[in-house]
Amino acid sequence: MVMSSYMVNSKYVDPKFPPCEEYLQGGYLGEQGADYYGGGAQGADFQPPGLYPRPDFGEQPFGGSGPGPGSALPARGHGQEPGGPGGHYAAPGEPCPAPPAPPPAPLPGARAYSQSDPKQPPSGTALKQPAVVYPWMKKVHVNSVNPNYTGGEPKRSRTAYTRQQVLELEKEFHFNRYLTRRRRIEIAHTLCLSERQIKIWFQNRRMKWKKDHKLPNTKGRSSSSSSSSSCSSSVAPSQHLQPMAKDHHTDLTTL
């Protein structure tokens, strides 16, 4: 009772809301039409088809954007589904646009040529370049000399004397420590060696013999003798000049 009297006596204004019928008839929802929800014209038992019929390629060109000028777009409703990414909505009975045709399959030869680089030959036909061999990479010995090799001086190999050759050379060295040219040639032919090998062996054997007998080297002795002779020649003139200086000094004192 108190609540109703307060609302009557107060200046509270009762809001005037339009009835539901007027709101539906003149409002935003009424402008959409009776078939906005897609069930007024077709009935409650309408079932949209599950699969759209696929048209032939002759009916509609590739990449069609929509229906012709004579056809009208149906009203948008909840019972319709979008027809494509371009914003075109197709009715359930309207055929959807044809998907793009797949590109033609290339030929096997053309595919292989396109994948491979034309500048680079295939791996099977790649030409193998020969390895570059420089002169310093070649190992040449005296026994196996390449006649076509025109590089630097060939490297000499160490001669391996047999037991019989060493025995004959030791026997010859016991009688003669120095060989003549004629005797060296004879020994070289007998032992199947070269004159150079015989000469080098005797030089090494003489050095070993001097070392065993503790004899001075002939080269060192010759150098020491030459140095002593030069010293004696330089001292002799100074000794000769000393008496002459004394005589000259006595002459000056007498005057």
From Swiss-Prot:
Residues 31-127, 212-255 are annotated as: Disordered. Residues 222-234 have a biased composition (Low complexity). Residues 245-255 have a biased composition (Basic and acidic residues). Residues 94-107 have a biased composition (Pro residues). Sequence-specific transcription factor which is part of a developmental regulatory system that provides cells with specific positional identities on the anterior-posterior axis. Keywords: Developmental protein, DNA-binding, Homeobox, Nucleus, Transcription, Transcription regulation. It holds the Pfam family Homeodomain. A motif (Antp-type hexapeptide) lies at residues 133-138. It comes from Homo sapiens. GO terms for cellular component: cell junction; chromatin; nucleoplasm. This is Homeobox protein Hox-D4. One of its GO terms (molecular function) is sequence-specific double-stranded DNA binding. GO terms for biological process: anterior/posterior pattern specification; embryonic organ development; embryonic skeletal system morphogenesis; positive regulation of transcription by RNA polymerase II; stem cell differentiation. Gene3D superfamilies: Homeodomain-like. Belongs to the Antp homeobox family. Deformed subfamily. It is found in: Nucleus. Residues 154-213 bind DNA. Forms a DNA-binding heterodimer with transcription factor PBX1. The lineage of its organism: Eukaryota, Metazoa, Chordata, Craniata, Vertebrata.
